């Protein structure tokens, strides 16, 4: 009996040790949006194993969050989705006593973010960037006879995009990104609450639809880098990554990024802990790790997106830190718009319009 009891105690102890060693944090992030060694280094330092999945649209993430059983411990929503998700009870409050690196964040940015998250109670800024146009310099010159793209007219006017269609044009697969871009191009409010404005944007998108090869929010990275397409309406850092891959391949493909003269979207992505998280301690540990200047500096260097950490800039590769496509100068920032949270009826209208545009019917 003593032997059996002793064996039982040993088995329980071993199970406990194994459980402690098997601490995990389940992360749901945008594709191509973490440093090359970030997850590996975090696990090596903390013993917490990251279980990592990716998505490529806010709508996909929101569907999981609002279903109530996300299965994740850390997620990365864009800021203008955050307010609605907070009100829906999708997240739990941060325990800032577990975020010792919080003070590294830019207080001016934190103040701006309080619009959707009063007191910064639920969200931690991760990275920020812009939307614009990535393009193959040589192929665009051959198709259009121009050295650079400086206007949304290159993809939003049929006579231009038709010429580019032979070498391939991709659009982001997101109503939330592409419809406001068209509204802004048409001189309308990108955060309009007027249904008539959305009908105009839809009509214009339908004009160029025949010349769009595909809609996807990450595939264009490799396709630009490989020369499979020549133009993509996309995210700044994704185009940065495409350019870096093209350069590494050494095949003479030059990829450039433009924030068109009409302006574009400036956005902020946040780190948040879902209400159903089963590993809250580990979630805080991972977020706190990303708040370390040297960690987020390495992330920015790799993915080509700006970060809100005041101490990270000096630790970054200065070619990246001084790149105007990553950290735009003030005159460019002045012509950017920040997406607002829109009423549900407008969101539904955008979704219906986008379905029509993608189907071409």
Q: Where are the predicted features?
A:
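Gram-negative bacterial Sec-dependent N-terminal signal peptides
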Residues: 1-21
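Early extracytoplasmic/lumenal segment of secretory-pathway proteins
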Residues: 22-85
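Extracytoplasmic ligand-binding site segments that recognize negatively charged/polar headgroups
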Residues: 76, 82, 86-211, 221-225
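A ligand-binding cleft/hinge motif common to bilobed small-molecule-binding domains
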Residues: 81-84, 231-252
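Short beta-strand->loop
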Residues: 92-103, 153, 249-265, 274-276
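Periplasmic-binding protein-like
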Residues: 198-207, 213, 251-272
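Conserved C-terminal helix/tail region of periplasmic/extracytoplasmic solute-binding proteins
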Residues: 222, 330-361
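Mature extracytoplasmic/periplasmic domains
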Residues: 269, 274-335
């Amino acid at each position: 009996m003593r032997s059996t009891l002793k064996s039982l105690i040993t088995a329980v102890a071993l199970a406990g040790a194994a459980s402690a060693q098997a601490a995990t944090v389940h992360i749901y992030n945008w594709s191509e949006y973490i440093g090359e060694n970030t997850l590996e280094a975090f696990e090596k330092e903390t013993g917490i194993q990251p279980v990592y999945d990716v998505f490529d649209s806010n709508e996909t993430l929101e569907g999981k969050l609002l279903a109530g059983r996300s299965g994740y411990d850390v997620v990365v929503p864009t800021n203008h989705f955050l307010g609605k998700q907070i009100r829906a009870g999708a997240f739990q409050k941060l325990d800032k006593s577990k975020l010792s690196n919080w003070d590294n964040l830019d207080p001016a940015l934190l103040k701006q973010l309080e619009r959707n998250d009063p007191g910064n109670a639920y969200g931690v800024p991760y990275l920020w960037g812009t939307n614009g146009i990535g393009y193959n310099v040589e192929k665009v010159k051959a198709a259009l006879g121009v050295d650079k793209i400086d206007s949304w007219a290159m993809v939003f006017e049929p006579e231009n995009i038709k010429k580019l269609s032979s070498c391939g044009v991709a659009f982001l697969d997101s109503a939330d990104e592409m419809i406001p871009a068209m509204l802004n191009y048409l001189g309308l409010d990108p955060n309009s609450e007027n249904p008539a404005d959305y009908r105009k944007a839809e009509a214009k998108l339908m004009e160029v639809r025949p010349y769009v090869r595909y809609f996807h929010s990450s595939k264009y990275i490799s396709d630009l880098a490989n020369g499979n397409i020549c133009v993509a309406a996309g995210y700044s850092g994704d185009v940065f990554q495409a350019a870096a891959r093209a350069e590494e391949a050494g095949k003479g493909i030059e990829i450039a990024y433009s924030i068109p003269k009409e302006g574009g979207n400036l956005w902020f992505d946040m780190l948040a802990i879902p209400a159903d998280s089963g590993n809250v301690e580990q979630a805080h540990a991972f977020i706190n790790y990303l708040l370390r200047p040297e960690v987020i500096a390495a992330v920015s260097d790799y993915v080509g997106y700006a970060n809100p950490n005041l101490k990270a800039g000096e630790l970054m590769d200065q070619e990246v830190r001084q790149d105007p496509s990553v950290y735009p100068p003030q005159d460019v920032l002045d012509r950017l718009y920040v997406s607002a949270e829109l009423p549900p009826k407008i969101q539904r209208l955008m979704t219906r319009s986008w379905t029509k545009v993608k189907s071409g019917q």
